[in-house]
Swiss-Prot record:
Bilayer-spanning residue ranges: none
InterPro entries according to UniProt: ArchSynthase1/Queuine_TRR, TGT, TGT-like_sf, tRNA_ribo_trans-like
Similarity comment text for this entry: Belongs to the queuine tRNA-ribosyltransferase family.
Example GO biological process: tRNA wobble guanine modification
Cofactor list: Zn(2+)
Protein name: Queuine tRNA-ribosyltransferase
Binding site for substrate: D89, S90, G91, G92, F93, D143, Q185, G212
GO CC terms in record: cytosol
Gene from which the chain derives: tgt
Length: 372
């Protein structure tokens, strides 16, 4: 992987990630393909909305269908028929989301499979082995996602174990040609975040991710972390904000120097009839759309807006038709890609401030201040 910085406007960066399977223009949003598929989308339709990289879930693909099945095809690219880059998360977040079903030790995590109840173990070495089998272009280290809220002592213990697991992940990654990203933890505590970052830099990674956000904390707390943390990170490595989020969160992350994002929000909200537009969120199942012959968004170039009315989308949603979820997903993912393209163009032109002001004005929202 090669990362180039092409332009900068304030703290916001315009860059490019290059892989043998293709390039990714940054800032970039990665659609989430948990089971090797972006829900409701074919691989071609994911390309059509402008995505250049997708995210796969190590934990879920390991449990089902299993690496043995995927390896019979080659790797995840061959299995899912996606010939562009793939980032795989390590499985850590999903393991720690199991609550009482898991037991954390220094070695890793013992848990019962949510698929069949079998006893399973995953540690850094297992996670790296699975991601190697998947043929991931970007591999994430195995870490513990610090919960919110957490005391400073709890966040410190978690962060220190994640650093030890990061070193084991680095060793287990070995001579793999895939890029390996470290994950900064430390909860809401700047000193712990700084220690985590320094520890990861000492180990050495191709990119760095900000973990432990979008885990239930107020948005103000998230922005506090983003106000200082990206600025501490090296200029020559890509910066990835994990699991975030709303369109406004992407804009705020980019303003603070983040390069990469992923979130299930555009696909999950689409399946529930919540559609993103420049003027805000449209709840398509509301009765006001029943007779509307207008497109969902007049200036949107997605297949949904180019061919179907709000009335038809409303009808599909009320009937629970799968086409409704598919058309909604096409629009939401295209909307996210259009926001990212707008941010890239604005950074190149040095007009990010004007872009941000217009973005919030169309929503009737004030522009959140940046830290001095």
């Amino acid at each position: 992987m090669r990362f180039e910085r092409l332009a900068q406007d304030g703290q916001a960066r315009r860059g490019r990630l290059s892989f043998p399977r293709g390039t990714v223009e940054t800032p970039a949003f990665m659609p989430v393909g948990t089971y090797g598929t972006v829900k409701g989308m074919t691989p071609q339709s994911v390309k059509d909305i402008g995505a250049e990289i997708i995210l796969g879930n190590t934990f879920h693909l390991w449990l089902r269908p299993g690496t043995e099945v995927i390896e019979t095809h080659g790797d995840l690219h061959d299995f899912a028929q996606w010939d562009k880059p793939i980032l795989t998360d390590s499985g850590g977040f999903q393991v720690f989301s199991l609550g009482d079903m898991r037991k954390i030790t220094e070695e890793g995590v013992h848990f019962r499979s949510p698929v069949d109840g079998a006893k399973v173990f995953m540690g850094p070495e297992e996670s790296m082995a699975v991601q190697r089998s998947l043929g991931s272009d970007i591999v994430m280290i195995f870490d513990e996602c610090t919960p919110y809220p957490a005391t400073e002592a709890e966040a410190k213990r978690s962060m220190e174990m994640s650093l030890r697991w990061a070193e084991r992940s680095r060793i287990a990654h070995g001579d793999s040609p895939s890029a390996l990203f470290g994950i900064i933890q430390g909860g809401m505590y700047p000193e712990l975040r700084e220690r985590s970052l320094k520890g990861l830099l000492d180990i050495g990674f191709d990119g760095l991710a900000i973990g432990g956000l979008s885990v239930g904390e107020p948005k103000e707390e998230m922005l506090k972390v983003l106000d200082y943390l990206p600025g501490w990170m090296p200029d020559d490595k890509p910066r990835y904000l994990m699991g975030v989020g709303k369109p406004e969160d992407l804009v705020e992350g980019v303003r603070r120097g983040v390069d990469m994002f992923d979130c299930v929000m555009p696909t999950r909200n689409a399946r529930n009839g919540y559609l993103f537009t420049a003027e805000g969120t449209v709840k398509i199942r509301n009765a006001q759309h029943r007779y509307s012959t207008q497109a969902l968004e007049a200036d949107c170039d997605c297949h949904t807006c180019q061919h179907f009315s709000r009335s038809y989308l409303h009808h599909l949603d009320r009937c629970g038709e799968m086409l409704g979820a598919m058309l909604n997903t096409i629009h939401n993912l295209r909307y996210y890609q259009r926001v990212m393209a707008g941010l890239r163009t604005a950074i190149e032109a040095g007009t990010l401030t004007a872009f941000v002001e217009d973005f919030y004005a169309r929503r009737g929202m004030p522009v959140p201040p940046l830290a001095a």
